Amino acid sequence: MKIILILSIFLICFLQLGQSVIDPSQNEVMSDLLFNLYGYDKSLDPCNNNYVECEYINTTSTIQTVKSLSLGAPLHQYVITQDLTPLQNLTSFEVNEKIYLTSSFFNYINKFSQLERIVTYSLNLTIPDDTIFPAIFETFTIYKPSVPLSKVIFESPIKNLYVDSPLTGYSIPTLVNVNPYLGNLQLPVTYYSGFPSNLSQAFPNLQYLAIYVNNDMNQNNYHNFSISNIGVFKNLKGLDIEFTDSDNPQEFSIHSFLSNVPIIDNLYIYGQGVTIDPSVGIIDLSYINPKTFLKIQIQQTSLLNNCKGIILKSPKKASFNSYYNTFSYECIDFSNIADFSDYYNDYEQYLPNIDNAPLLTGVDIYQSVVVGDIPESYCRINYLSLYYNQLNGTVPSCIQCLGGVKGGDIVLPNPFLNFNKTTEPYCPTFKIDENYTHLVATDGTEKLIITGTNLGWDGNDITPIIANSKLGITIPKGVGTNKSITVTFQNGEQRTFNYSYVPPFIKSYGFLELDGHKYFTINGTGFDFVDSNNITINDQQITFDNAMGGGDNDGLIIFPIDELPNFATESKFTVSALVGGQSSNEVTFYYFNSINITEEKLVLNNTGGSVDINGSFGTNNTSLVSVSINGTNCLVTSYTNSKLTITYPSNQVGDNYVLTLNVGGYAVNLVVEYIEGGETPTPSTTPSTTPSTTPSSTPTQSPDDDGSTSSTLSTSFYLITLLFLIQQFI
């Protein structure tokens, strides 16, 4: 009997060891907290609560630790007074608006060494200025603050700060110290809050800025106020300015923000109240770097109301999107715009004049009060959509060519005089020019370009380059000459076009390692991307695999290095190719086992200059060495087999350049970035970041079925079982 009893006790202990339990110190504080918030039974495992997410301390442990708290609505308003420091592994902390934090929480917040994120849906205390946030703390989201924000929030290493829905008592502190960490900032502004005019100076690395302006003049004791910025936002990519709607909106001038954002790529303005300072005359955004492709979006705003001529000019290739705004198209300079869309504009007017808009490729106007004709100039727009407006004139010939069914998809419904859904296609002006280029690339990325009149927008294997006048016909991968393709145009016309693939052209050689195997490579154009390639090296025919790469880069063909004929270092060898019946150039190369450059990236001044390049170059024969950047030759002024000095040309700022070092035909590439002249060229070590978006405005609950927690039998169950067995054997 004693043996059975001992075995039973052992079995119970063994089973208990196999179950997961929360860390005892965390269990005490969590049980008390959940009981006070939700009446949660203290005998239950806190990790099984929907508001708690736990994880095992490590892969072999049965002990769990609290990783995330998303505390939803409590039974009643509650102030957290418990000491939460036992939750040492907490990474995310979210509290409902009826749950309040105390200053003591922020006094020990630095003890949460893994804490990355806090979301509080109410803030009724000013965080102490001596608060020290954890080193890895990234995101602080505050809803409904009713107290002044502490300057420590703005001076801490937080990367993302989002503030929303302020209440009476909210204010923004004066910014004194520079904070290089903050990357994303969302900040509400009221008449009483104040606003720092040195944002760009205080946060030099800010990438996303959202300003929510409460401009409701109906509120008691509200008066006109304005906000401004001194300095340049050197790294700002996104700017969002939103105004609360009201019957009596306040008017703002935002020119100081829009005139100091040189690399912005997204501008969003919402709500009544934003205006352009009359003394400025025009918001000229053309200074913004065109490589950012700025997207301008305005919604339900008075920005362009009552303009007198042009008041907005964009950078090159920008897109302009308008929703529920009432303005004249004469307010906008279309010369730099690439895409234009306007939805629900109640201002009665004709379509925009696009004669001086050479970059415009897309026009989308929907449910707006545009009247009159569609001019012939709109036939060149690649992406055209004009339906559900009030156009009551005539359509151009390119639309007539398509008829009511296909053309109607672009411009109907509208009450035109000469066009409806039943209109038959009529296209006497359809014409294809005979003088097109008959040569195309073998990699399938190049199109056969044709020109003409009223060619339409698309068709099978057809894409518009300039709608109706210049189209590209997709040609598949292939090789050889005397090929043909038959295409059907949008108006139903069929035509056959003849073409040939470019002959092979050999540029250089190199080496490549794939899956542990080393290959000899030949670089060039006109290789076969479908089947093998016939290459002659020193009069010996060798079959290389089908080509790789292509597109913006040269093609690449490979052959196993251990099957290649043996060459002495710096010995000559000739290479030629026969692809699709077409012969390549014959080139003479010099063989080297290895050529390499030490630098991983080269950073150069955009004004041009001189730079050293280190590596192993295989020879002292300078006649075999050449250097180029994106095809432009550089002057080699000094050379040894381990170091060379070049004079390089000027270029626009950017990181899309490639330096090619060619030693006897062996080519090695190196990424090059051009920076503003005057800056010291150094390798870039700063990692790229992605602006965060505004977080959800509602608390989230952690599901209990995601594998992070497991249901456990309570200790009381085992004790009851043990007592029962003991009683049976006494």
Swiss-Prot record:
InterPro entries: Ig-like_fold, IPT_dom, LRR_dom_sf, Sexual_fusion_gp
One Pfam family recorded for the sequence: TIG
Cellular compartments annotated: Cell membrane
Keywords attached to this entry: Cell membrane, Glycoprotein, GPI-anchor, Lipoprotein, Membrane, Repeat, Signal
Cell membrane as UniProt keyword: yes
Regions crossing the membrane: none
Matching Gene3D superfamilies: Immunoglobulins, Ribonuclease Inhibitor
Modification after translation (UniProt): The sugar chains may play important roles in cell fusion. The GPI-like-anchor contains a phosphoceramide group, rather than a phosphatidyl group.
GO cellular component assignments: phagocytic vesicle; plasma membrane; side of membrane
Residues in Sequence repeats: 683-686, 687-690, 691-694
Glycosylation sites noted in the Swiss-Prot or TrEMBL record: 58, 89, 124, 198, 224, 392, 420, 435, 482, 498, 523, 534, 596, 605, 614, 620-621, 630
Region (Disordered), start-end ranges: 678-711
PANTHER family attached to this UniProt entry: CELL SURFACE GLYCOPROTEIN GP138-RELATED-RELATED, CELL SURFACE GLYCOPROTEIN-RELATED
Note: gp138a expression is much higher than that of gp138b and may well be the major gene for gp138 product.
Protein's recorded name: Cell surface glycoprotein gp138A
Name of the gene this protein is made from: GP138A
